[in-house]
């Protein structure tokens, strides 16, 4: 779905059947095909409050998510609708509509809490939908937010400093939007007009008092303010006062609805399309459709096993799958590019190695782009090994191509020579001189042939070796030569053969040196790109930590200004810990990166430093090539 999904209607993503949550595999298959980044908008709220209408409007449809026209809740579980994003190219908008909270027909109310928590975990923009006003009752109905500390974990194990795990929610929680339907009040505070956002923030202020009822009432307010740093509010008038139209609102054209409601709905939709963020995990990991599917499966499996969905565990699960795919993607890219760019046989080994270096550099960049949380660079090492093996295949293919091409040319050039030998044309007085002149012409013509490849000398050397016995026979039978002249000719032939063997050995040593230099270059390129990635990840981590600190400080200062000194003081330990984390990230980056790079260098050197392994592969391969393509001479 690179060009964007074409879902004509929503599909259930998480089924809620008999108090059991199940992931719908058909929905996962749809997400698997979406490799684009996703903007995920989820809506939750009490049943029969018009959530589905808003989501249909975001999808640009009158109908889709079931609206229902009775007091029964229509939506069960979490439903999904993937549509091309209207304003972000190459992004998919994923709309999640959840079953109504507080439905008396449902059995275990715990499922409401899980649906709420899953929506928070899966989306990048979280919409809470309620009716009439944000008052004490509305906030009490939002008690699900207070349960998130029991239903979601950031880390798989408790923090050693004892600071609550929920302090890190702010680093990965979605933006929060409260939509208030059928709003009839005036937006005023103490006689002065206020904005919708100011209305929400005023409603979220804590109430003074220490009795249990006040504390219970304050808890949802406190959780929203602490967990969701970016908050927004939209109010909506009643769509129409006509009960018949309301009962069939999915069939009603917008023109039949209240103009003010239309305007408010359009403003809301425009905000979502413009400001709803791409879904990301901690440290800036971008979520695509297929990654979203993996997250959904991981979280629901955790719920069904009796565990608490944990972001850290989910990211590890996701990384295992994604990094394996990144290895394959990068290796495939390398193979495709080499196949496209290399014309076999290459004139020199260096030409092939330069092409390899360019394709490998691009493939490493692809691996880096699509991998994350590669603990101990396990997958990078797999990628390196895979690329090294593929490079070996290309080297062998290059050698084989060179052998075939050179043999074909030599067959062609030596055809006359072989026919003359068979006809006994050189078995005459002066035949040796004639034979040598013919052979020298073949050699001159052979070296004039362009792009013979890396085995040109070796193939010709084999040709010369095949002629040794023939030349000896012609020489000894040539009655025009004296014994001394024959002896001189034999010595000259041996000397020339030794020189050519020396040239061949020199070429092999040079190629071995080129291969070792190429391996060293490959190692340095891998380390350079890893270093850049580690530095970027550290910068992203630092930004997240600073954001968490600044948000926590803002909440703390708000408590103080609102007269809650005890709450202000309770947050000191939290803030101190954030500052320590930031100091560690700032000051310990160089040793940490250096240690990682040194370790990788050692391990990759072990992988790559098989010059004998790779070069031996080449040398061994040559003898097998000659067996495979036997010389006719």
UniProtKB/Swiss-Prot annotation:
GO cellular component, one term: cytoplasmic vesicle
Its EC number(s): 3.6.5.-
Entry binding sites for GTP: 45-52, 67-69, 97-101
Database matches in Gene3D superfamilies: Guanylate-binding protein, C-terminal domain, P-loop containing nucleotide triphosphate hydrolases
Residues annotated as domain GB1/RHD3-type G: 35-277
UniProt-listed SUPFAM superfamilies: Interferon-induced guanylate-binding protein 1 (GBP1), C-terminal domain (SSF48340), P-loop containing nucleoside triphosphate hydrolases (SSF52540)
Reaction(s) catalysed by this chain's protein: GTP + H2O = GDP + phosphate + H(+)
GO BP terms: cellular response to type II interferon; defense response to bacterium; immune response
Keywords: Antimicrobial, Cytoplasmic vesicle, GTP-binding, Hydrolase, Immunity, Innate immunity, Nucleotide-binding
Protein origin, superkingdom: Eukaryota
Region (GTPase domain (Globular)): 1-310
Enzyme class: hydrolase
Subcellular location: Cytoplasmic vesicle
Pfam families: GBP, GBP_C
PANTHER family cross-referenced by the UniProt entry: GUANYLATE BINDING PROTEIN
Its job: Interferon (IFN)-inducible GTPase that plays important roles in innate immunity against a diverse range of bacterial, viral and protozoan pathogens, such as bacterial pathogens Listeria monocytogenes and Mycobacterium bovis BCG as well as the protozoan pathogen Toxoplasma gondii. Confers protection to several pathogens, including the bacterial pathogens Listeria monocytogenes and Mycobacterium bovis BCG as well as the protozoan pathogen Toxoplasma gondii.
Name of this protein: Guanylate-binding protein 6
Lineage: Eukaryota, Metazoa, Chordata, Craniata, Vertebrata
Designated gene of the protein: GBP6
């Amino acid at each position: 779905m690179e060009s964007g999904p074409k879902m004509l209607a929503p599909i259930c993503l998480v089924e809620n059947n008999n108090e059991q949550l199940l992931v719908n595999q058909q929905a996962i298959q749809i997400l698997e095909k979406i490799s684009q980044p996703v903007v995920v908008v989820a809506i939750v709220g009490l049943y029969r409050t018009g959530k589905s209408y808003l989501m249909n409007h975001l999808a640009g449809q009158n109908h889709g998510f079931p609206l229902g026209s009775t007091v029964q809740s229509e939506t069960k579980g979490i439903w999904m609708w993937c549509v091309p994003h209207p304003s972000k190219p190459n992004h998919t908008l994923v709309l999640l509509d959840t079953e109504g909270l507080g439905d008396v027909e449902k059995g275990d109310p715990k499922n409401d809490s899980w649906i709420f928590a899953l929506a928070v975990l899966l989306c990048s923009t979280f919409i809470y939908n309620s009716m009439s006003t944000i008052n004490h009752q509305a906030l009490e109905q939002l008690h699900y937010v207070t349960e998130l500390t029991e239903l979601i974990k950031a880390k798989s194990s408790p923090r050693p400093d004892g600071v609550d795990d929920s302090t890190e929610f702010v680093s990965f929680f979605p933006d929060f939007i409260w939509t208030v339907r059928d709003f009839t009040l005036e937006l005023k505070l103490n006689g002065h007009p206020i904005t919708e956002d100011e209305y929400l923030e005023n409603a979220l202020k804590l109430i003074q008092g220490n009795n249990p009822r006040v504390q219970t009432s304050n808890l949802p307010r406190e959780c929203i303010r602490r967990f969701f740093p970016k908050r927004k509010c939209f109010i909506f008038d009643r769509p129409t006062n006509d009960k018949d139209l309301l009962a069939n609102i999915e069939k009603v054209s917008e023109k039949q609805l209240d103009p003010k409601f239309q305007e408010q709905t359009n403003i809301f939709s425009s905000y979502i399309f413009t400001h709803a963020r791409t879904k990301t995990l901690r440290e800036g990991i971008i979520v695509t459709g297929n990654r979203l599917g993996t997250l959904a499966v991981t979280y629901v499996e955790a719920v069904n096993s009796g565990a608490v969905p944990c972001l850290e565990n989910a990211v590890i699960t996701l990384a295992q799958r994604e990094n394996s795919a990144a290895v394959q993607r990068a290796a495939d890219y390398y193979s495709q590019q080499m196949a496209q760019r290399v014309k076999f046989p290459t004139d020199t080994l260096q030409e092939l190695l330069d092409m390899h270096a360019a394709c490998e550099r691009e493939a490493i960049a692809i691996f880096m782009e699509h991998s994350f949380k590669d603990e101990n660079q396990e997958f990078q090492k797999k990628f390196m090994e895979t690329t090294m093996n593929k490079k070996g295949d290309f080297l062998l293919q290059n050698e084989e191509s060179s052998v075939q091409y050179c043999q074909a040319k030599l067959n062609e050039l030596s055809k006359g020579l072989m026919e003359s030998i068979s006809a006994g044309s050189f078995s005459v007085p002066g035949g040796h001189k004639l034979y040598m002149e013919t052979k020298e012409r073949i050699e001159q013509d052979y070296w004039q042939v362009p792009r013979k490849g890396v085995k040109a000398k070796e193939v010709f050397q084999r040709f010369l070796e095949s002629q040794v016995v023939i030349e000896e026979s012609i020489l000894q039978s040539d009655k025009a030569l004296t014994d001394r002249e024959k002896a001189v000719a034999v010595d000259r032939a041996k000397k020339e053969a030794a020189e050519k063997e020396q040239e061949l050995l020199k070429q092999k040593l040079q190629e071995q040196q080129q291969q070792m230099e190429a391996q060293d270059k490959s190692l340095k390129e891998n380390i350079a790109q890893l270093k850049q990635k580690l530095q970027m990840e550290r910068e992203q981590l630092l930004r997240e930590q600073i954001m968490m600190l600044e948000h926590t400080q803002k909440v703390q200062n708000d408590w103080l200004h609102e007269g809650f000194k005890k709450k202000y003081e309770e947050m000191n330990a939290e803030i101190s810990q954030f500052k320590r984390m930031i100091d560690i990230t700032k000051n310990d980056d160089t040793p940490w990166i250096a240690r990682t790079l040194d370790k990788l260098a050692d391990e990759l050197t072990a992988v790559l430093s098989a010059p004998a392994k790779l070069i031996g592969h080449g040398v061994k391969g040559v003898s097998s090539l000659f067996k495979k393509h036997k010389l006719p001479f």
